[in-house]
C-alpha cells in the first residue's frame, strides 16, 4: 500500500489559520484558530494497513485546533462533537472508535476481542497522530503557545497517553528559549530546566555556557516529570557540575 511505503517523515502534515465568522444575538462574532493536521505513522498506520483490520476502516488522520487570542480547548470531535472533556487546552479531531451511545471515546484495558482492538486503536491514534499534530502546533505558534502545553493530567487513560506522547514528541523540537548566545530556540532534551525563581543560579550557569531555560512552575514540573528535558537546575545538578 502507498501509505505503508511512504517514509514516516514524508507523511502529509498541514498547518493553517482558520477564521470563522458567525452571527450571535444580532452581531457578527469572529474567532480565529490555528489548526495542525497530519497522517501519522507508528502503530496507528500499522493497524490501519493490516488486512485483518480492513473491516474497521481505521484511518490514521487527526488534527488539533487552538483558538487564538482567547481561552478554549478541551473538546473532542469525530467530525461531530463528542461530549467528553479531554483536559487538553486544544480541541482534538480524529477517526476515533466511540462507545455504543457515542458519548465517549472507547477505552478499557480489561477487554478482549473487538472491544480491546477499538481501545488500542484510539490510543494509537492519540499517540501516533494527534500527539504529532499537537507538537507541531506548539512549534508553529512559538511564544504564543505558552498556554497550550498539556499540563492537566487525570482526564482518563486515553488522554493521559496523548499527553505523555506530546511530551515525547516535544523533546526533539526547538520549543523552548534559552538566553544563551543572546537568545535562541532549543530542544527540551538539550536544555537545563530552571524555575523562574532560580534567577541567580540560572545566570551563573549561563555564564558557564549551559543552555538554561527559565520556566513557569507548572510547565517546569510537567517537563521534568515527563523526562522531557536534558537536566533540571537543582542543588544536586549544580554540585555535580562544579565537582
Predicted features, each with a name:
Residues 1-243:
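GHKL/Bergerat-fold ATPase module
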